[in-house]
């Protein structure tokens, strides 16, 4: 299947503005959209849209949204780019967590809470700034609040659910709208020796009956996108146990205030925000 990438680079503010426009416009299409810092000194960021087969149609839509001629297009070899990119990924440290691929087991140090996640079909290896920030808040929250159960909403690779389980042997529900992600999540939980603590389910939002069996939750973590987080604010609050904590990520710096306001409207209190590589992770109670 032919794969193409539409890409555009600009300063941080313009790149974030463009990313936000495209992320909202293509939310229902399923096209992966990424924003990456490519020049740290000059603060230049690149926005990419990955498409299959219909690159010309998508390019026309992009031109209509952000202006003609801004994005270039390149054809990509027909390979699994996420898996292929693992070769260039370095292990990530977030608090005491050490997230690594199978090729970096030799880099685990004494005292590390090691989580092995190979890049593949599900998003979330720990190499993304928003995931790293979330891991830091998870460590702090679990160690200070001692939750008795947890929910990882939009689990992806299950890196966050695994992190919770490595800190506390509590029941954890890990859900995702993508059945492939749910399969990968279960495999990763088993690989990391915490499968007995993590129950996985394919679910969109909170509509699945499994939530009735597990809620309310002392800890809810959700590393998805800003717009779904805002829409889900009432449901997330509804499924939170009294005195519980919520950790949100998948949020750009520029989206922080809107997401925070949605949860403060639900009566939640802002505890902390971590900023990592242009992304934020938010802790509320």
UniProtKB/Swiss-Prot annotation:
Pfam families listed in its UniProt record: PrmA (PF06325)
Gene3D superfamilies, alphabetized: Vaccinia Virus protein VP39 (3.40.50.150)
Metal-binding is among the record's keywords: no
Example of a GO biological process term: methylation
GO molecular function (one): protein-lysine N-methyltransferase activity
Residue sites binding S-adenosyl-L-methionine per the record: 131, 154, 176, 223
GO CC terms: cytoplasm
InterPro entries according to UniProt: Ribosomal_L11_MeTrfase_PrmA, Ribosomal_PrmA_MeTrfase, SAM-dependent_MTases_sf
The entry's keywords: Cytoplasm, Methyltransferase, S-adenosyl-L-methionine, Transferase
EC number: 2.1.1.-
Catalysed reactions listed for this entry: L-lysyl-[protein] + 3 S-adenosyl-L-methionine = N(6),N(6),N(6)-trimethyl-L-lysyl-[protein] + 3 S-adenosyl-L-homocysteine + 3 H(+)
Subcellular location: Cytoplasm
Highest taxon in the source lineage: Bacteria
NCBIfam families: PRK00517.2-1 (NF001784)
PANTHER family named among the record's database cross-references: ELECTRON TRANSFER FLAVOPROTEIN BETA SUBUNIT LYSINE METHYLTRANSFERASE
Record family assignment: Belongs to the methyltransferase superfamily. PrmA family.
Known function: Methylates ribosomal protein L11.
Name recorded for this polypeptide: Ribosomal protein L11 methyltransferase
Organism lineage: Bacteria, Pseudomonadati, Pseudomonadota, Alphaproteobacteria, Hyphomicrobiales
